[in-house]
Amino acid sequence: MIENQNYIKKDFTTTKLAQQYDCCTFTDCNFENAKIGNTTFMECKFVNCNLSNTQLNVTSFKDVNFNTCKLMGVNFNDCNTFLLQFNFNNCDLTLASFYQLTIKNTSFISCNLTEVDFYH
């Protein structure tokens, strides 16, 4: 488990991620097209990061905030649904999918939600 770390301008596109991040902040990081599997993010913040087309196979997001991030084409329906909780502020979620997910406590503030799939 990695705790209380700040990552700035790090490229995670080819980096193998740890299994769990707790109270970490990712700023100006690139995850575009990365394969993030079986990773847990607890109380983390993503600020101005590119996560477009990232594959989230069984990834857990527990109380995670995304601020000014690109998340285009991300299939959140591949996430681990146990305690799933995240919020989005000023993010681009064009073509993202939350298909069959229960996201009642999720907020989308000033986000681009063009063609996002919220079908339940």
Mark where each language-model region is.
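Tandem repeat scaffolds
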Residues: M1-H120
